[in-house]
Structure formats: structure tokens, C-alpha cells
């Protein structure tokens, strides 16, 4: 497998990172190394490519950005660990379904290994749940065998804006975060822990 470079982008506007993902993906070559971007966003709602406006109940003046990822509307904000996967899935011998499974399983493994939390998936509702409350949302896009976008893990944040929407298109979906279980939850640690689990799974699948 080729090297995967990690980039810690810190706190960045969603639109800037989205544009950078598009630029990276459109200009990469078969020799371009894969990258994983670690980032935190100021408050923003993002709509998936099939997102329905009625799932935004009241934006409360939080910006809304249309994207080309899968899924419906979600919220990003400070204290949420976001990880983006800029991968050549053909080179890594991954299909779209296998990539989604790997992204989800890495989160389940991370929560179990480092926090002794038993997380699960729900058929037909992508994401990671603890006691049927959603702790992580994912949305990916694959273009010409290259992936971008990724997963957002609620870590230590204000969850209130999730009540302004139907998260991922589900009315009344309850959200949770790592800080509900560990008050000192830290997004930098979560990003590193998650990435380690993801890379391990990716290496084992090739």
C-alpha cells in the first residue's frame, strides 16, 4: 500500500476545505499519495447532494453549504472531530461499500479500544450509534475512483444546533457525543486514535 499522509488543518472554514478537497481530487495523478485530513469547522450546516431543504427546520443564522457528498443535512461545529479521506480506492482495491464499512468499523473499534464504549450501526442509516443515539456521521463521494469527504465524530461540542435540523434526514434523531461519557474528551486525541484504527483496517484489507 502507498503512504498515507496525515494533515492536521486545525480550525478551518468548511467552504475552504471543501474547495481544497475538490482541487486535490481533480488534480491528483496515479502517483499521488493518499491523504487523511484532520480538521475542525466553525458552525455550519452542510447539505448532501440529495439533501432536502425541509430537513432544515430553522437555521438560526448558521450558514448552509451545499456539497456533493452523499447523505442529507448535518451539522459541523467546534469540538467535533472531522476526518476526511482523500484516497485512490482503486489503487487500494476498495469498493465504495468496503470503504464505508471500513470508515464505520474504525470508529466502532476506536470507541471500544480507547473508551470502552460499545457502539453499533443501524441498517439503512449510515453512521455510528451508542444506545441508538448518533455519535458519528459520515458522508463520502467517489469520483473516478477517488474518494473525498469523510466522518464527523461528536467529541466535546454544543449539540444544540442538531435540534435545528432533521439530522441526516431523520426527524427526532437523538445525538450524543464522547463528552457525555468522558468529560475530558479531546478532538485531537480522537482524530489520532481514529486514524490509527482506520489505517490498520485499511492495511489488513489489502
From Swiss-Prot:
Residues at the site labelled Lowers pKa of active site Cys:
134
Binding residues for substrate: 69-76, 137-139, 150-152
Q: Name one GO cellular component term.
A: cytoplasm
Q: Which GO terms describe its molecular function?
A: lipoyl(octanoyl) transferase activity
Q: Which residues form the BPL/LPL catalytic domain?
A: 30-206
- Enzymatic reactions: octanoyl-[ACP] + L-lysyl-[protein] = N(6)-octanoyl-L-lysyl-[protein] + holo-[ACP] + H(+)
Its annotated pathway reads: Protein modification; protein lipoylation via endogenous pathway; protein N(6)-(lipoyl)lysine from octanoyl-[acyl-carrier-protein]: step 1/2
Which principal EC class is assigned to this enzyme?
transferase
Residues annotated as catalytic? 168 (acyl-thioester intermediate)
Q: Kindly report the protein's main subcellular placement as a broad class.
A: cytoplasm
Q: Which GO terms describe its biological process?
A: protein modification process
Locations listed in the record: Cytoplasm
Residues in a coiled coil are none
EC identifiers of the protein: 2.3.1.181
**Does the keyword Cell inner membrane feature in the UniProt annotation?**
no
Query: Which UniProt keywords are listed?
Result: Acyltransferase, Cytoplasm, Transferase
Query: What is the role of the protein in this entry?
Result: Catalyzes the transfer of endogenously produced octanoic acid from octanoyl-acyl-carrier-protein onto the lipoyl domains of lipoate-dependent enzymes. Lipoyl-ACP can also act as a substrate although octanoyl-ACP is likely to be the physiological substrate.
Q: Enumerate the HAMAP family for this protein.
A: LipB
In its miscellaneous comment, the UniProt entry states: In the reaction, the free carboxyl group of octanoic acid is attached via an amide linkage to the epsilon-amino group of a specific lysine residue of lipoyl domains of lipoate-dependent enzymes.
What family does the database annotate? Belongs to the LipB family.
Q: What is this protein called?
A: Octanoyltransferase
Q: Look up and give the organism this protein is from.
A: Francisella tularensis subsp. tularensis (strain SCHU S4 / Schu 4)
Lineage of the species this protein comes from: Bacteria, Pseudomonadati, Pseudomonadota, Gammaproteobacteria, Thiotrichales
Gene this chain is encoded by:
lipB
